Regions:
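Active-site metal-coordination/substrate-binding segment of hydrolases
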Residues: 87-158
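Structural motif
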Residues: 89-92, 120, 155, 187-190, ...
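Acidic/histidine-rich catalytic neighborhood of metal-dependent amide-processing enzymes
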Residues: 129-203
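N-terminal helical capping/dimerization or prosegment-like subdomains
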Residues: 2-104, 283-287, 417
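Conserved short loop/turn motifs at secondary-structure junctions
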Residues: 34-40, 158-163, 376
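Short beta-strand segments
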Residues: 94-96, 157-159, 190-193, 212-214, ...
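Metal-dependent amide/peptide-bond hydrolase catalytic core
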Residues: 1-4, 8-11, 42-43, 194, ...
């Protein structure tokens, strides 16, 4: 018998594209943006099952297929190719069957149907993450067909509900809670939902915040009688940012992990109730996010941001003003401008274990197949994987779509990249036999 890599061979490109065409055809129905758009991952899962069920134990094949749903139409699939040694295992997880939304009017092609332009495979989900669903399905199909004798059990976990966290208990969080992934802790877990063919070794945490500013509305010809909420908001945001960067500077470990940026705190949205050009606004809301490298604690940052706001409120007269009649206190009216801060659900970043066997085999496989290895880190966030890490899983992350098209209009991936991803997977399986 040849080597594992010889047996598993190359990606069957025709079969991959055929399956991808079917799952991209469902992408309109797996957009995830509740309450308007609740994905029906069952539609994608059915196409995966159509490929793998003939090779399952119920049909006399080697694959153990477990279809798990915690809500109607919200499917997860756990597919297992058993090895010969108890406790020896590796897994490919995170291939999610939902997608972010797409507006066909903004695209150069139909986002909800696969179109092929040479090496380019175009459509919503090609990079994130239906392309990976189809890719890992082909890997498990090849294992089921060729039946190599492996020491390690190989498990693939296709999940629901990755793109939105407003509805919980549907996807990988529920699988972990119910113990269905416990045995995956005995070996490396490869989360297949990043891009650019290199190991992603660090991701950022995210804290969405809103600062509501209250001043006093008045005629713009009498600015001394107003508290300008816009000016107060600008100066307060600047002060909060200055304090944040003092307390959470670039961390020494960020260089080791290759983070492109340190932690950041910035506004991204601004709103106010409206009014005439001759009215000084009495309130406004500034919203934004903190992107936090994984070497800082999310709860520590939230506590600090609240402290900044409390201190600014207590000392609001010390805040910089804008011009001779700009002020944030009206003593004669016993009025003070004020701020309040609130947070939406925060997520923590991840720093992968660079000493683990999983990381080393991923790097070696990448170098062999792609020709070089250059791990990277971003302060973009990958939900769910920090929780897996805290539960005791050795999580490593990789992906074979394109970062440039991630969540973007005119999303596409390259067939040649996906074919290399398949070879990386077979190299990982082969190395872990030693």
């Amino acid at each position: 018998m040849g080597s594992v890599e010889d047996i598993l061979g190359e990606l069957n490109r025709d079969a991959f594209v055929s399956l991808l065409q079917k799952v991209i055809g469902e992408s309109e129905h797996v957009q995830n943006n509740p309450p308007e758009l609740i994905p029906q991952e069952l539609l994608v899962a059915n196409h995966v099952l159509e490929v793998l069920r003939p090779l399952s134990t119920e049909c006399g094949g080697p694959l153990i297929v477990n279809h798990v749903s915690y809500s109607p139409g919200r499917s997860n699939l756990i597919v297992e190719y058993p090895g010969t040694e108890s406790g020896k295992i590796l897994s490919f997880v995170g291939m999610h069957m939902d997608v972010v939304t797409a507006n066909p009017a903004d695209w150069e092609f139909n986002p909800f149907a696969l179109s092929i332009d040479g090496d380019k495979l175009c459509g919503r989900g090609t990079t994130d993450c239906l392309g990976h669903v189809a890719l890992v399905t082909q890997l498990m199909k090849k294992l089921g067909e060729t039946k190599p004798k492996l020491k390690s059990t190989v498990v693939a976990v296709f999940i629901a509900s990755e793109e939105n966290s407003s509805i919980t208990g549907i996807g990988v969080d529920a699988l972990v809670k119910n113990g269905l992934l416990d045995k995956l802790k005995n070996g490396p877990l490869f989360w297949i939902d990043t891009a650019d063919k290199q190991p992603c070794i660090g991701t950022g945490g995210m804290i969405p915040w809103k600062v509501h500013v209250t001043g006093k509305l008045f005629h713009s010809g009498l600015p001394h009688k107003a508290i300008n909420a816009l000016e107060l908001g600008m100066e307060a945001t600047k002060e909060i940012q200055l304090r944040f960067y003092k307390d959470f500077p670039a961390h020494p470990k960020e260089k080791d992990y290759g983070f492109a940026t340190p932690s950041t705190m910035k506004p991204t949205q601004w709103s106010y109730p409206g009014g005439g050009i001759n009215q000084i606004p009495g309130e406004c809301t500034i919203a934004g996010d903190v992107r936090l490298t994984p070497f800082y604690n999310v709860s520590d940052v939230m506590k600090k941001l609240q402290e900044y706001v409390d201190d600014i409120n207590q000392n609001i007269e010390k805040l910089d003003t804008r011009g001779p009649v700009s002020h944030y206190v009206l003593p004669d009216e016993n009025l003070r401008g004020r701020l309040s801060i609130s947070f939406e659900e925060a997520t923590s970043g991840v720093a992968c274990n660079l000493d683990s066997r999983g990381f080393h085999v991923l790097c070696k496989a990448t170098e062999k197949v792609v020709g070089y290895v250059k791990p990277y880190s971003i302060t973009g966030s990958l939900p769910l994987i920090r929780e897996l890490q805290e539960e005791g899983f050795d999580v490593q992350t990789a992906g074979y779509g394109l970062m440039a098209t991630y969540h973007a209009k005119n999303e596409y991936c390259l067939l040649s990249d996906m074919a290399q991803g398949y070879k990386v997977f077979t190299s990982i399986i082969s190395q872990l036999e030693d």
